[in-house]
Amino acid sequence: MMKLVLFGIIVILFSLIGSIHGISGNYPLNPYGGYYYCTILGENEYCKKICRIHGVRYGYCYDSACWCETLKDEDVSVWNAVKKHCKNPYL
């Protein structure tokens, strides 16, 4: 009986772990529709700068392209991000 209870607890814990998602994000796109490629993997100023342009505070180089944490789908394109975050009414 004790083994069955322990097994049930383990199954519940693994199901909870599976439902926890990591921090979402996206690869931002440049004005030509391509990725911003990078060579220094991990944190670097280039990717942080690119992510700030897209309206996100933090990003890093992952799989040779800049990855921005918490970047929403509608802000992936640089033009959509600029229109959303810029105060210029002519955009």
Swiss-Prot record:
Tissue expr: Expressed by the venom gland.
Q: Which SUPFAM superfamilies does this chain map to?
A: Scorpion toxin-like
Q: List the disulfide bonds.
A: 38-61, 47-66, 51-68
What's the short name of a Pfam family annotated to this entry?
A: Toxin_3
Q: Where is the LCN-type CS-alpha/beta domain?
A: 24-87
List the subcellular locations: Secreted
Tell me the first and last residues of the signal peptide.
1-22
What's this chain's function? The heterodimer non-edited LVP1 induces lipolysis in rat adipocytes. Induction of lipolysis by LVP1 appears to be mediated through the beta-2 adrenergic receptor pathway (ADRB2). Intracerebroventricular injection is not toxic to mice. The edited BmKBTx-like, similar to beta-toxins, may modulate voltage-gated sodium channels (Nav) and may block voltage-gated potassium channels (Kv).
The family line of this record is:
Belongs to the long (3 C-C) scorpion toxin superfamily.
What name does this protein carry? Lipolysis-activating peptide 1-alpha chain
Q: Which organism is it from?
A: Buthus occitanus tunetanus (Common European scorpion)
* Source organism phylogeny: Eukaryota, Metazoa, Ecdysozoa, Arthropoda, Chelicerata
